[in-house]
Regions:
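C-terminal catalytic histidine-bearing segment of alpha/beta-hydrolase fold enzymes
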Residues: 208, 218, 222-274
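Catalytic nucleophile-loop/oxyanion-hole region of alpha/beta-hydrolase
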Residues: 54-56, 61-62, 76-114, 253-258
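Short beta-strand/loop motif that positions the catalytic acidic residue
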Residues: 201, 206-209, 213
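N-terminal cap/lid segment of alpha/beta-hydrolase-fold proteins
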Residues: 1-37
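Short beta-strand element of the alpha/beta-hydrolase
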Residues: 39-47
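Acidic catalytic loop of the alpha/beta-hydrolase fold
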Residues: 166, 212-216
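Mobile cap/lid helix-loop segments that gate and shape the active-site cleft of serine hydrolases
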Residues: 3-5, 9-16, 146, 162-197, ...
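Primarily recognizes the serine-hydrolase "nucleophile elbow" in alpha/beta-hydrolase
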Residues: 98-175, 189-190, 194
Length: 274
């Protein structure tokens, strides 16, 4: 933890931590390396409503699960757009682009195939991941070194109960306000809605949402699906009747949605991404 940053524990169960990081001052990644790397990597963007970044249930737990299956995982702690950064609403995308390029640049050291790097995002981190998978070519920061000559395009994208649309009738209100303000013009809403900005060479997508999600409406995943289909981009969509929001990899209990990591793994293997 750097000065001004804060980690808050939200769980009363020491065996089941649920920490968040607030006021991130320097973006960075936590790396989970498999005993025997299989060549695939996943950049993980946890959620937090653009208010904070979740550490455990959408970050470290997922990283450990992936590493146990031979996938090198990088959990991204990205800067938050409402905290005065010069990049404003592009700051998390800048951090995600930089992370993707650093992973690609360091592929030899990590035992990674540079063409097998995907991104996975949860909730507001789903917006970060979708923004990267659609806006990887946007120039949102000044190049720093040789890594920035590489592509930031992920080879696949998995969005788990994602924030997508910035339209007032569909958006998660807190994420929208912290990203683009309380009363943004329609052009700004569109510019920061990945479903309306899908390029022709976007990677394949995996979408997951519970229809009873009362935090981020399932319409967000459906809007992303429609945007991808309109551009001819491959997309696997998994909807579950029950699950709510924020269940991560291990907190859906006995509900059918608890099986989603295996569904993702099957999809990723079919894409050559796991």
């Amino acid at each position: 933890v750097l000065p001004d940053e804060q980690i808050v524990e939200r769980s009363a169960d020491p065996a089941r931590p649920d920490r968040i990081m607030q006021a991130i001052t320097a973006p960075r990644m936590a790396v989970f390396r498999p005993a025997t790397p299989g060549g695939a990597a996943v950049l993980i963007a946890p959620g937090g409503g653009y208010r904070h970044v979740v550490i455990d249930k959408e970050g470290f737990e997922m990283g450990r699960w992936l590493a146990a299956r031979g996938v090198t995982a990088f959990v991204l702690f990205y800067r938050l757009p409402h905290q005065g950064w010069a990049a404003g609403p592009d700051v998390a995308l800048a951090d995600a682009q930089r992370a993707a390029r650093l992973i690609r640049h360091g592929h030899t050291a990590y035992g990674i195939d540079p063409e097998r790097i995907s991104v996975m995002g949860f909730s507001a981190g789903g917006h970060v991941a979708a923004s990267l998978a659609t806006g990887y070519a946007r120039a949102v920061y000044a190049p720093l070194d040789a890594a920035d000559r590489l592509s930031a395009r992920p080879d696949g994208a998995a969005l788990i109960y994602p924030v997508i649309s910035m339209r007032a009738d569909l958006a998660h209100p807190g994420s929208r306000e912290r990203l683009i303000g309380a009363d943004p013009p329609p052009a700004l809403e569109l510019a920061y809605s990945p479903d309306g900005n899908v390029p022709a060479d976007a990677p394949p997508f995996f979408l997951l949402h519970a229809e009873d999600d009362d935090v981020v409406p399932v319409g967000n995943a459906m809007a992303m699906r429609e945007g991808l289909k309109a551009r001819g981009i491959a997309v696997d969509t998994h909807l579950y009747a029950a699950g709510g929001h924020g269940f991560g990899i291990s907190r859906a209990g006995s509900k059918p949605v608890a099986a989603w990591p295996e569904a993702w793994l099957a999809w990723a293997r079919a894409q050559g991404l796991a």
